C-alpha cells in the first residue's frame, strides 16, 4: 500500500504510520515467532522508509502498543491479561482509543519533525 501511495505522499509531504507491537521489542510468550518476526520486520521497514522518504518531507513512524483490550485478545486467558496489567504502571490494558490518540498525534503538524521513531503505547510496561 505504501509503495502505491508514494507519488501522492511525496507530493503532499504526507505521513506513514505503521502499527507494530511491543512484542517486537521485548520478551514474548511461547509460540509467537511468526507474529514477532512480522512486527519486527515492520519496524525495520518503517525506519528504512523514514530514511528514504525523509528528503521528500514524508515522515514515517511506528506505534507499538502492548496488549490492547479488544475482541482480538478476548481468547487470551484472564490470568495472562492480569499479569500484563500488573506489570503496567497505569494498571490497565491499552484501549483502541489509546492507540488512535498516538496515531492522531503522529499525523498532526505537532509531529512534523518526528520520523523513524517507534512510539510505545504500553502504559509504561516497556519503559526504555
Regions found by a protein language model. Give the residues of each.
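Short, small/polar-rich loop/turn modules that mediate ligand/substrate recognition or access, typified
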Residues: 13, 54, 59, 114-116
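Short C-terminal tail/terminal secondary-structure segment
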Residues: 26, 104, 115-128
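A conserved structural motif in NAD(P)-dependent oxidoreductases
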Residues: 88-99
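Residue(s) in the substrate-gating loop at a strand-loop-helix junction
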Residues: 21
Amino acid at each position: 500500500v505504501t509503495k502505491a501511495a508514494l507519488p501522492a505522499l511525496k507530493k503532499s509531504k504526507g505521513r506513514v504510520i505503521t502499527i507494530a507491537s511491543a512484542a517486537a521489542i521485548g520478551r514474548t510468550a511461547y509460540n509467537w515467532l511468526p507474529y514477532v518476526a512480522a512486527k519486527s520486520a515492520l519496524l525495520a521497514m518503517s525506519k528504512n522508509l523514514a530514511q528514504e522518504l525523509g528528503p521528500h518531507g514524508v515522515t514515517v513512524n511506528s506505534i507499538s502498543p502492548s496488549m490492547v483490550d479488544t475482541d482480538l485478545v478476548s481468547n487470551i486467558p484472564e490470568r495472562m491479561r492480569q499479569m500484563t496489567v500488573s506489570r503496567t504502571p497505569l494498571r490497565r490494558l491499552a484501549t483502541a482509543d489509546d492507540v488512535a490518540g498516538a496515531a492522531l498525534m503522529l499525523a498532526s503538524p505537532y509531529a512534523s519533525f518526528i520520523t523513524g521513531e517507534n512510539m510505545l503505547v504500553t502504559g509504561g510496561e516497556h519503559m526504555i
